[in-house]
């Protein structure tokens, strides 16, 4: 039976076996090319966007798309190397044709297709070599045909194959959900819908998981079994995808793909939203009775569209001359919402629709085009409007192009003269983490708190490393981390975010921006933000979530100093939220790990703090990746070593107190107090 122990054992085995390797890592986000992909048979790259298409309507054909060069799949001792791969795929039959066969993710000792057959053999084997132990082929099949000769369980299954199409394990395609991971939902493989798959092999066991694209990775794998691939994965192997057609045909598409020998979080780097859809529509227009009339209507429609375009161009030119359209609008985020529509959506920014406030802004719930949205209204005086507009442009230029499952999406924007600037976000039904910890009857349980920490780490990793330009958030705190309807955490409120070229280390400011208790010592002293100051804020957030205590509370020791003190006494677990202790449902090892991660991140020396990539790997695997190589390391040793923890009171004195911040000459008017989030947003 599946249990959390299974995940713990799998992660522990990964920790023990993931030594420093000469493996590779790559990410294809709808950017397949004939250069970065080896195309065989009927496989092609279709663009735009650049996706890998394995098959077409040709009967009895094979299509393969492989990484262009061999990779090392075993160590010097002949032990198979661990790997993690994730990809987004779509399978769909062609209109008016019966569906065909599936496809497989594969490791092959060769690239050519001469030793493979089409149809039910998926372009992997033929009638003679299927089952041959010398084939040295490993695959995970996604099949939509029930072949009795291979003992297929049904016509919609996922299977793990070793040298044979008779799977060593197979399950109906789908995922496990619910709070206990016991609710199974079947996913129809050949519906044309986009699905994401995760395949993780730690050297002795394999996990296979799938879900709808843009959904969170299910905690419980679809398939989780011990697996010995010694003698199967060789020194030099090809890796990629294969599919075939027979008398029956259908399309097999790979939209995105990531692979790594060392990073189990590689799947988080895939863009899962705004992908092309291949779902089948109704009957073909070519066979409809109104086809001829439709062509005539189409000509009329084309003329109408041309007329509308001309009207649009003239109107835009007039607006630009009148100063209503900013020069940057089209480039960064073209979806401007009319102010009158925003007024209607929020009922005139009524108090009953207000769900949050902070600084010079308020957040309202609204309904635009039938969908709930969160509307952030930033008020300003005429004197402030120029500077505020610049910050507004920074936010639009950042959020308008960022796409990640753990970042709140920007839906549009608006403004009213120099009085107010307006941002329209996705609505987060479950409000802020701040609210769910301190001001809500439905308090976050331990499992949900760990998920929130992992989600925020994933979102911050994307901001720091996952885009062409580094993005500094500059105000990470519990009220800026929001929860969607599925309780997934997302980073919100980019009002203080700055774009940073990767060639530069820091962004200088003339005053401190941030929130008391979350600001790194060097930020308070110099006003200079960096990725390390974001990491510090993340560390404070982790301590806050685990302890159920705000960073600064009147009459109490600051949370950072308090947890450092508990660490010195070897009682760090005593910092756990008393309400969680009373509930009794928590994992001591996870509590200890989370608090130590928090302490790593809030170290007063920014050079000692980990990068967000390292934080993500600690959370996923309990290990650190050092610059220049990977090695196992004890978190306890790292936190308690003399390198990290200076003895006596000297260490604590390096952390800024509330008074330090208040007395800072750079504090001025930019100091932010806690935002209050009353409801979901």
From Swiss-Prot:
Protein kinase domain sequence ranges: 349-624
Annotated stretches, region: Legume-lectin like: 24-260
Keywords tagged on the record: ATP-binding, Cell membrane, Glycoprotein, Kinase, Lectin, Membrane, Nucleotide-binding, Receptor, Serine/threonine-protein kinase, Signal, Transferase, Transmembrane, Transmembrane helix
Topology of the protein relative to the lipid bilayer: Single-pass type I membrane protein
Parts of the chain on the Extracellular side: 24-290
Regions annotated as coiled coil: none
PROSITE patterns: PROTEIN_KINASE_ATP (PS00107), PROTEIN_KINASE_DOM (PS50011), PROTEIN_KINASE_ST (PS00108)
Catalytic activity: L-seryl-[protein] + ATP = O-phospho-L-seryl-[protein] + ADP + H(+); L-threonyl-[protein] + ATP = O-phospho-L-threonyl-[protein] + ADP + H(+)
Compartment list: Cell membrane
Main location: membrane
One of the record's GO cellular component terms: plasma membrane
Glycosylation sites: 31, 42, 56, 72, 126, 202, 207, 228, 263
Transmembrane domains' residue ranges: 291-311
Organism whose genome encodes this protein: Arabidopsis thaliana
InterPro entries on file: ConA-like_dom_sf (IPR013320), Kinase-like_dom_sf (IPR011009), L-type_Lectin-RKs (IPR050528), Legume_lectin_dom (IPR001220), Prot_kinase_dom (IPR000719), Protein_kinase_ATP_BS (IPR017441), Ser/Thr_kinase_AS (IPR008271)
Name listed for the protein in its UniProt record: Probable L-type lectin-domain containing receptor kinase VII.2
The enzyme's E.C. designation: 2.7.11.1
Signal peptide: 1-23
Membrane-side (Cytoplasmic) residue stretches: 312-681
